[in-house]
């Protein structure tokens, strides 16, 4: 999926201006997946602290190239069917961002999904390159089914794609205003970038950075946020159940990755990285077998895997994450 994300964006942005932020442990994997990417453009996080710190660190690197650059935040685990439309929307969003606005892409919902956050649109601000631009009225975290149904039927709500576009100077100003403690840490890191002390300072400062999402840290509290609705054939492959929609199924509606033998098994996702999985009498289930863990759940509960991840973190079982 990382390779697909690279291929989606390279017709729009030169490779030397594309950066990947990942865990330090995966830097070599990224280099193997995208060997044509400049090594200096792979930024390794010592420790994950959420999307806000990740974006802030990226903005520092981009500011060194161009203080007035427009920055697009994209995610590698998204499936996007219509890449051309995404690139057109990004072009329109970049034009809006030059005015000093924070811009996000809102996905036209095709069902009442409870696994996504929602964006409520406000007044129409403009039309840019054929794309309507609205002021964001409100962000809502993942709703219950009844609320998601109401949102979908209203026509005023979009799924929060997690894709953002803004000027580097704009987002850094928002960090200064809304997350001043983190901004002070960024300034400390910025002073050391490109020097012999860079790694030492980064390790010392990053250990003190607090976890924060970009939605709560910035987007929900910023004053000038715009949304551009898009219909790009989007899925957030953050859920195992999503693979049932994206990958080809057999005659019984099962999506199988790896070795599987099933009896009376229908509508299931079975993913095994190392050994044969056998099932009897399963319907609409997710079975994921990896080297060190096994997940079994109804597909409608697949979004709750994120709750299990939180539980594992609280229990100190980071080796399973």
Regions found by a protein language model. Give the residues of each.
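Conserved N-terminal catalytic core of the sugar/cofactor nucleotidyltransferase
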Residues: 1-75, 79-85, 91, 300, ...
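Residue-level signal for inorganic ion chemistry
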Residues: 2, 58, 77, 119, ...
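Short coil/turn connectors at secondary-structure junctions
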Residues: 15-16, 38-39, 66-69, 98-102, ...
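Short beta-strand segments
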Residues: 21, 72-75, 104-108, 140, ...
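Short histidine/acidic/glycine/proline-rich micro-motifs that form metal-
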Residues: 78-80, 109, 234
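Conserved core of the sugar-phosphate nucleotidyltransferase
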Residues: 83-206, 226, 299
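Left-handed beta-helix
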Residues: 168-321
């Amino acid at each position: 999926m990382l390779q697909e994300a690279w291929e989606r964006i390279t017709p729009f942005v030169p490779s030397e201006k594309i950066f990947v932020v990942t865990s330090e442990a995966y830097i070599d994997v990224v280099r193997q997946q995208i060997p044509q990417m400049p090594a200096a453009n792979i930024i390794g996080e010592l420790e994950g602290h959420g999307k806000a710190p990740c974006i802030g660190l990226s903005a520092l690197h981009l500011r060194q190239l161009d203080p007035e650059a427009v920055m697009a935040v994209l995610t590698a685990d998204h499936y996007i069917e219509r890449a051309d439309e995404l690139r057109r929307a990004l072009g329109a969003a970049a034009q809006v961002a030059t005015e000093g606005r924070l811009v996000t892409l809102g996905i036209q919902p095709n069902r009442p999904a409870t696994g996504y956050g929602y964006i409520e649109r406000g007044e129409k601000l403009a039309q840019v390159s054929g794309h309507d631009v609205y002021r964001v009225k409100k962000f809502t975290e993942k709703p219950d089914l009844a609320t998601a149904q109401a949102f979908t039927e209203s026509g005023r709500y979009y799924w929060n794609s997690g894709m953002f576009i803004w000027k580097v100077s704009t987002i850094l100003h928002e960090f200064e205003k809304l997350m001043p403690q983190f901004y002070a840490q960024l300034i400390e890191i910025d002073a050391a970038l490109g020097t012999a002390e860079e790694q030492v300072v980064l390790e010392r400062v990053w250990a003190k950075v607090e976890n924060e999402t970009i939605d709560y840290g910035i987007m929900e509290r910023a004053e000038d946020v715009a949304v551009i609705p898009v219909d790009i054939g989007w899925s957030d492959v953050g859920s195992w159940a999503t693979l049932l929609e994206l990958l080809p199924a057999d005659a019984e509606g099962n999506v199988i990755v790896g070795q599987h033998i099933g009896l009376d098994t229908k509508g299931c996702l079975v993913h095994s990285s190392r050994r044969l999985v056998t099932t009897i009498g399963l319907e609409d289930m997710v079975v994921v077998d990896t080297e060190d863990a096994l997940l079994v759940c109804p597909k409608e509960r697949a979004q709750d895997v994120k709750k299990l991840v939180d539980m594992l973190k609280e229990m100190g079982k980071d080796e399973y994450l």
